[in-house]
Every structure is written in structure tokens, then in C-alpha cells.
Amino acid sequence: MAISTQRDSRWAALALIVTAQFMVILDVAIVNVALPSIKSDLDFSPTNLQWVISAYAILFGGALLLGGRLADLLGRRRLFVTGLALFSAASLLCGVAWSEASLIGFRAVQGLGGALLVPAALSLLMTIFAEGRERNLALGIYAAASGSGAAAGVLLGGLLTSYLSWSWIFFINVPVGLAAIALTPLLLRESRADLPHRHFDLPGAASVTAGLMLLVYATTRAAGDGWGAPVTLALFGAAATLIAAFVVIELRSKSPLLPLRIFRLRTLTGANAAMAIVGAVAFSEFFVLSLYLQDVLRYSAVQSGLAFVAFALSVVVISNVAQAVVGRFGVRPTLTLGLLASAASVAWLARLPIDGHYFWDLFPAFMLGGAGMGLSFVPITIGGLAGVERSDAGVASGLINTSRQIGGALGIAAVSAIAATATRNYADTHAAVTATSAPALDHGFQTALYVLTGLLLAGAAIALTLVKPAPAQAAEVAPADADAVALDEAA
């Protein structure tokens, strides 16, 4: 194999990969509770503040497929280190940002670093562990890091912002990134796809990266300009044109960036669709609940962060149990159960009153929601790599992460618009209520959470429809080929 298979070094390598993944996912959410401080210190306008999140999401989500294929062609360890270096440098620059434009620009560079790092990390994991029980365990740990990263980000963001400053939500990445770069040559060997060519699909890369970025940008703009505004429609039209051009290019290319044949794998297709929904819900839920806790319940940044500890712990614990559940029952029932549990949790949260109590109103829903996410991320990650050939390991890793990030970016933009519209409508129809009052804000948040509940129910239907049923024992069958990258389609 391309990576050392000694038992101790494999798990040390996994720890390195998981740490890098956790750091990148953490940064998606860590800024949420720091936004009020950032707004005050850098004199952000209300309309530009969302770009602290959106700039990261646009570059991260838009360039993941590019990062995945570059890892296959140029070397997974090389892209892993490059991504770490870019992410760490951008984090340092974010911490010393002096204006709106500088912080937004450095966040975009940070997102690009994440787009190079994440698919390389997951494809390295696939080459370290052969399919079967050990890989499922490794993927369970990886998924736990991914699933808990957002919740941990809210907690850590609150602590750092309250006791140090918002700059430290970025500075904290620098020593972690430098340590990871130093350890990489010791724990990871170079790995690249065994392809008959080294051609790079530049037209495909340019069209899909621009198309996905424009799609996220259009959705973000729609929140302020309106969904029917000419500029919004023009942006969506341009994004659709670029993505359609990408499909045509890939169908004709001899060395496609994204081999469209992989979508013939039902489990992979269903897993990516479910991941887009889970990403939309996870990003939006933390965004909405962070605002609910601070604007309606008047929690401090630290209190808001601590409120999510139950959710984070539930994700970590259940993610590590979920790999055994997948091994016993298969991807489809585990994923469906996770999505339904998440839907029940969000529906519970949609009933939150303006004087909600943490232990009676929030804690049970957070525990159930964390369990649902834990039961979802593991089968999605396993299913998203099901049947993938070794030569496509990087691009499959990029695809599953693209589904998550694009879903999250689109979700948070759409849900923000829905919540804002519902809040304004409530204020307009209640004479004594303003759009910034707790009752109006609470109504907007409730409306957004009901929409997310519907999305999760749709995800459960997709899992039942697209994900291939499997014999219970399939996920634990030992591999015939130790170098195989693909998980058995029956996993």
C-alpha cells in the first residue's frame, strides 16, 4: 500500500488526519458567536457581516472537487500539507485583519486552504485502512470529528471571544496547523492515483468551481436583494449555465475532473444527496439557535457555547457507536434512523417559546439531535465512498465534502432569508411588535426550524429510495484485497 500499514502508525496517522479535519470544520461554526464582537471592532455593516461566514463557505465548497482531483494527480500528502499551510497562514491573517474587506478576503483564502486539505485527508484515510471493520471504525472516528466540529466551534468561539478576543478564534489554528505540518512527513507517506495519464481537466475545473461559487453567491445575495430580483435571477442563471457546461465537458473529457459514471452507484448518489441536506440543516441550525440563545434568551457568548456541549458530546458518543450499527444493519436503516431522529429534534426546537428553559426545552432536543447527526454522518461517509475505485478516491472524497459544504452554504443563506421574512411579516401583522423584539425573532426562528424539519424528512425519503439495501453482515466482511479503496457496495 502507499501508506504504512503498521498498526500503531496507522492509528497515529488517523489522529493527525482527524485533527486536521476537525480544525477545518470547527472554523465553519466558530465565528458564529463572535460575529457581534467582529461587527463592533471592525465596524461591519449589517449586510456585510454574513460575508465573514459566506466568503469561507463559497471558496471551501466551490473548490473541493478541484482539491480532490489535484490530490489524486499531484499527491495526497502534498495537497494535505499545502492545504494545512494555506489554512494556517490565512488564519493568522484573519486574526490581524484591520477592516471588513481584509477579514472577508482572508476568510476566502482560508476556505481555499480547507478545500485542498479536506479531500486529501479523507482519501489518505481510505488508502491507510482496507475496507471492512477497521475502515468503518476509522470512518466513524472521522465522522465524529466532522459531526462535532460545528458544535465544538460554537463553544470554543464563545470562550475565546469572551475571555481573550475574537482574533483568537483564528490564532488558535496556527500552532495546530504548524504541528500537523511537522508531523506529516513522519506519519504519512505520499500517495497518488494510479492513472494511465496525468492530464488535468482545466475546463471542467474552471466551470464547476465558478458555477458552485456563483450558486452560493447568488443564494447569499438573494437574502438581501430578494429571490425575484433581476440580479438574483441573473446570478442563478449564470450558475446554472456553468454547471450545465461542466456536465457537457465531463461527458466528453477523456480525463474528467468528476467521472460521472460514479453516480451509477446508488448508495454513493443517495449518500451525497443526504449529505447536502444534513449540511444545510447542521449549518443553519447552529446559526439560528446561536441567534435564538443570544437575541431571544439573552445568553452571553460563553453561555451560548456551553449550551451546545450536550449536542457535541452526543454526536461524539453516537458516532463511535454508529459504525457498529452500520456493520450490523447496513447503511440504509442507520441513515434513515439518524435523519428521522434529527427531524424529531428540530421539530421539538421549532416549538421553543420566548422564555425557553435550557433543561426542559433545549437539552432533550440537543441530545436527540446530536444522536441523529451521529447516526447520519457515519453511514453517509461510508456510503459516499461505496464502490469507488482507487483512482477516484480523491474526487469521491471531494464530492462528499462538496455536498456538505454547498448544502450548508445554500442552506444558511436560504434559511436566513426565510427567518428574516417571517420576522418582518410577524412584526407587520402585530401592531405592538417590532422586527427586533423577542416575539418577532422567535417566530422567524420557529419558521426556519420547521423548514429544516421538512428537509430532514425529505432526506429520510431519499435514503429509503436511493441507498441500496444490504445484508447485515456485509459491512464487516474482510477485504480480499488489502489495497482496495472501495467499500463494498453492500456496506
PLM region spans:
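Transmembrane-helix bundle of Major Facilitator Superfamily
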Residues: 1-186, 320-322, 329, 335, ...
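Intrinsic disorder in cytosolic terminal tails and internal cytosolic loops
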Residues: 1-9, 194-197, 436, 466-491
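Flexible interhelical linker loops that connect adjacent transmembrane helices
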Residues: 2-4, 181-209, 251-266, 327-328, ...
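12-transmembrane solute porter fold
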Residues: 11-26, 31-33, 46, 203, ...
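Short helix-kink/termination motifs in transmembrane helices of multi-pass secondary transporters
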Residues: 23-34, 59-62, 76, 169, ...
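C-terminal membrane-cytosol helix-exit motif in multi-pass small-molecule transporters
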Residues: 122, 174-193, 209-221, 238-253, ...
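A residue-level signal for alpha-helical anchor/packing sites in multi-pass solute transporters
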Residues: 124, 128, 159, 183, ...
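A gly/Pro-rich, aromatic-decorated transmembrane alpha-helix motif that marks the paired
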Residues: 148-164, 213, 217, 406-426
